[in-house]
Regions:
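Conserved alpha/beta catalytic core and glycan-binding cleft of carbohydrate-active enzymes
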Residues: 30-32, 45-175
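Active-site neighborhood of glycoside hydrolase catalytic domains
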Residues: 1-60
Length: 175
């Protein structure tokens, strides 16, 4: 990463499956990059960005082998995590769906331009759509775990309390 930043002026690094890396490894990489200076290296390392897919799954799930670089475990590091909550709310579908076209998202016609594949009742589709609107609202607020919003059904919840596939939707302490 140092080589790419110094010699090719790459200013951001995205990690696929970042959750399969130890959080300490990612923090060391961030620290090493931050040591680069304009005078010495031709790049301001403090301005370089690291982010990735902070998914919690597979053989390392739930910190089985090490503390993972996952959503909610990178607070205060300056390392970002991809927002799958916002993606799924807008695009539709989810990571465990057999056919991602069935559950339409906020931006793909859910409740306004139905594709005919979703066989749920209108009430269930409406509730899902409105929940996706709540996920979009939270995403626009930086997916902050402490952000408070009023959900479609009138409840006041924090981002951490808003459901996303059985876990809290809000995972960030800063946007």
């Amino acid at each position: 990463m140092i080589h790419w930043a110094k010699y090719y002026h790459v200013d951001g690094f995205r990690f696929d499956l970042m959750g399969h890396h130890p959080a300490e490894e990612m923090k060391r990489a961030k620290e090493a990059l931050s040591q680069l200076t304009l005078d010495k290296d031709g790049v301001d390392g403090s301005r370089l960005y690291i982010y990735g897919e902070g998914w919690n799954f597979g053989e390392v799930a739930n910190n089985a082998l090490f503390t993972q670089a996952t959503q909610g475990q990178l607070d205060g590091t300056g390392i970002g995590a991809f927002n799958d909550r916002l993606r799924d709310a807008v695009h539709g579908g989810g990571p465990f769906d057999d056919d991602h076209r069935v559950l339409q998202g906020f931006g793909s016609g859910a409740f306004s331009d139905l594709n005919g594949l979703d066989t749920r009742s209108e009430a269930d589709r409406r509730a899902d759509y409105l929940h996706r609107v709540d996920l979009v609202k939270l995403g626009l607020a930086g997916n902050l775990k402490d952000y408070t919003l009023t959900t479609y059904d009138g409840k006041t919840v924090s981002g951490a309390q808003l459901d996303y596939n059985g876990q809290g939707a809000g995972f960030a302490s800063q946007p």
